[in-house]
């Protein structure tokens, strides 16, 4: 009887735990640009120093995603964490599968990120460009 009780607890708690993980990971990617860094909040979030940016561009497509290295990929297009794109590990912070995507390259990492709408993504890109002062 004891083992049936434990199995029932597992069967009940597993969907609840999975639901919590999906809820937490599917929250909107909050991204802010401060004076000297870009902050991506949430699960697999990161801080990117503006001074470390070597390349910055707005891309319509991203390379093919070969596999998840350390991250989460949800059915609604959200992707967060490290992914293998072509032959390199890249950090993705994607709200959806539609471009444009902001591409950022530093000495240590490469990133692709986008926001819920084209307008918000372009606005974030403009903010980063302004902070970086690519003149």
Predicted stretch roles:
Residues 20-51, 55-57:
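Conserved beta-hairpin
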Residues 62, 96-135:
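Terminal and domain-flanking low-complexity segments
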Residues 41-49, 55-107:
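Non-transmembrane, membrane-adjacent beta-strand/coil modules in membrane-associated proteins
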Residues 9, 16, 31, 82, ...:
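A generic structural signal for ordered alpha-helices
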């Amino acid at each position: 009887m004891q083992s049936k009780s434990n199995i029932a607890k597992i069967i009940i708690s597993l969907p609840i735990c999975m639901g919590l993980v999906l809820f937490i990971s599917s929250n909107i990617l909050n991204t802010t640009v401060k004076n000297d860094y870009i902050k991506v909040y949430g699960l697999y979030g990161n801080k990117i120093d503006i001074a470390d940016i070597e390349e910055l561009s707005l891309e319509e497509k991203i390379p093919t995603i070969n596999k998840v290295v350390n991250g989460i990929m949800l059915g609604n297009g959200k992707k967060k964490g490290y992914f293998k794109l072509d032959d390199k590990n890249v950090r993705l912070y994607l709200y959806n599968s539609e471009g444009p995507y902001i591409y950022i390259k530093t000495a240590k990492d490469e990133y692709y990120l986008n926001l819920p709408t084209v307008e918000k993504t372009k606005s974030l890109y403009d903010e980063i460009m302004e902070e970086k002062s690519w003149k």
